[in-house]
C-alpha cells in the first residue's frame, strides 16, 4: 500500500483545502471547532453549499450526484473537511439511506428521494434499534403488515439520533413475523415523520438537553410504494448500510485537531514538560497515525463501492482515541474543564 500521496492527490488535497477555507463561512467553521454538539442550521447551510458544488455525496453513483473518485480521493475529501472544521454532510442522508436507495431502490424511489436527500431538503433519521433489539438487531419486533396499498406499522424505535429534526425515518420492520429465521422477514421502509400515529419522545440527559429519541408507531399507515427493494430483503440492505456507515467514522481529522489543541495548551501551561504527560500525548499521536494508515487500507479495499468489513475496527479504535483525547484535554485544562 502506498503511504504517501501522489502529486495528483496532493493537488487534489490542496484544491479542497482552498475550497473549504474560501466557500464555507468562517463563523460556521469556528462554531464547529468549538461546539460540543451539532448545529442544525450550520449542517444544513454547509451541505447545501457542498451540494451546489457537487461535493455533498461523492460516494454516490455519478448519475445521482456522486464523483468518480478513487477511495483515496474520497478519504482526502473527508479528512480535509474534518481538519478544516467543516460540518460533515448529514450521515443519515449521505452514508446511510442514500446509498441504499441508489443501490436497491426502484427508479421511482430514486427519482423521488435522492436529489432532495443530497441537498438536505429532506432530513432523515434512522429507525433500527428497539428496546430489546440493539446489539441483536435482527430481534426487532416492529411490524409492518401489508393491507392493500399500504403497510400497517406498529411498534417502537429507540436511540433515534436527531429525530427531533427529521422529516423522514428509514426503518427496519418485520413484514413476515412467521419467517423461520429472525434475519428473514425484515424489510426496509421509508416513513414520513408527520404521518398520523407517530409519537416522538426525547431521551433527556441530566442537564435537560437531548439528541436521541424514542419513536412510537401506533396503527401508522405507510404507502406500499415507500418500500425499498424487495419485501423481506431488508436484512441484506441493512448490512450494506452499516458497512457504509462505518466508512469515515474514525474521525481521524477531528482527533488530530484535538491533539494539536492539547499540545498547544500543555505547552502554554508547562504540562508538556512533565515526562509522563508528554509520553501519553506522544503515544496518542502515534496511535492516531496508526489509525490513519488503517483507514487508508480500508479505503483502498473498498473499490467498486463495496463496504469493507474491516471498517468496524475504525469505529472501535476511532472512538477509543476520541475518548483518550478528551481525557487528555480535561487533564491539561485543569479547573477550566469544569462547567
Locations of the language-model features?
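C-terminal helix-coil-helix/basic helical segment that borders enzyme active sites and/or dimer interfaces
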Residues: 28-37, 271, 275-278, 289-339
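Glycine-rich beta->alpha junctions and the first turn(s) of the following alpha-helix
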Residues: 3, 198-294, 312
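A structural signal for short hydrophobic beta-strand segments in well-ordered beta-sheet cores
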Residues: 142-144
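Internal helix-loop-helix
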Residues: 51-121, 162-168, 288, 302-310, ...
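A short, Trp-centered hydrophobic/proline-enriched beta-strand micro-motif
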Residues: 120-128, 172
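Glycine-rich phosphate/pyrophosphate-binding beta-alpha loops
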Residues: 133-135, 158-163, 206-207
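Intrinsic disorder at enzyme termini
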Residues: 1-13, 337-339
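A short core secondary-structure module
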Residues: 149-150, 154-201
Amino acid at each position: 500500500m502506498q503511504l504517501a500521496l501522489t502529486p495528483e492527490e496532493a493537488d487534489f488535497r490542496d484544491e479542497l483545502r482552498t475550497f473549504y477555507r474560501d466557500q464555507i463561512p468562517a463563523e460556521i467553521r469556528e462554531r464547529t471547532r468549538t461546539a460540543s454538539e451539532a448545529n442544525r442550521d450550520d449542517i444544513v447551510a454547509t451541505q447545501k453549499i457542498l451540494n451546489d458544488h457537487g461535493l455533498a455525496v461523492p460516494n454516490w453513483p455519478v448519475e445521482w450526484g456522486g464523483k468518480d473518485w478513487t477511495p483515496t480521493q474520497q478519504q482526502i475529501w473527508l479528512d480535509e473537511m474534518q481538519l478544516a472544521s467543516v460540518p460533515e454532510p448529514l450521515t443519515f442522508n449521505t452514508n446511510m439511506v442514500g446509498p441504499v436507495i441508489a443501490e436497491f431502490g426502484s427508479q421511482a424511489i430514486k427519482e423521488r428521494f435522492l436529489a432532495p436527500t443530497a441537498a438536505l431538503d429532506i432530513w432523515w433519521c434512522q429507525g433500527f434499534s428497539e428496546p430489546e433489539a440493539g446489539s441483536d438487531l435482527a430481534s426487532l419486533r416492529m411490524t409492518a403488515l401489508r393491507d392493500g396499498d399500504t403497510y400497517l406499522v406498529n411498534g417502537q424505535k429507540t436511540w433515534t439520533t436527531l429525530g427531533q429534526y427529521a422529516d423522514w425515518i428509514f426503518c427496519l420492520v418485520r413484514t413476515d413475523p412467521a419467517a423461520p429465521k429472525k434475519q428473514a422477514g425484515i424489510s426496509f421502509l421509508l416513513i414520513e415523520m408527520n404521518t398520523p400515529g407517530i409519537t416522538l419522545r426525547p431521551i433527556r440527559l441530566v442537564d435537560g438537553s437531548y439528541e436521541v429519541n424514542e419513536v412510537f408507531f401506533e396503527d401508522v399507515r405507510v404507502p406500499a410504494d415507500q418500500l425499498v427493494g424487495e419485501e423481506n430483503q431488508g436484512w441484506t440492505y441493512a448490512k450494506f448500510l452499516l458497512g457504509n456507515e462505518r466508512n469515515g467514522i474514525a474521525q481521524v481529522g477531528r482527533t488530530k485537531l484535538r491533539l494539536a489543541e492539547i499540545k498547544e495548551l500543555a505547552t502554554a501551561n508547562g504540562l508538556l514538560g512533565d515526562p509522563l504527560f508528554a509520553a501519553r500525548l506522544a503515544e496518542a499521536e502515534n496511535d492516531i497515525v496508526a489509525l490513519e494508515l488503517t483507514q487508508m487500507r480500508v479505503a483502498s479495499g473498498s473499490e467498486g463501492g463495496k463496504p469493507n468489513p474491516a471498517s468496524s475496527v475504525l469505529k472501535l479504535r476511532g472512538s477509543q482515541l476520541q475518548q483518550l483525547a478528551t481525557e487528555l484535554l480535561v487533564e491539561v485544562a485543569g479547573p477550566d474543564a469544569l462547567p
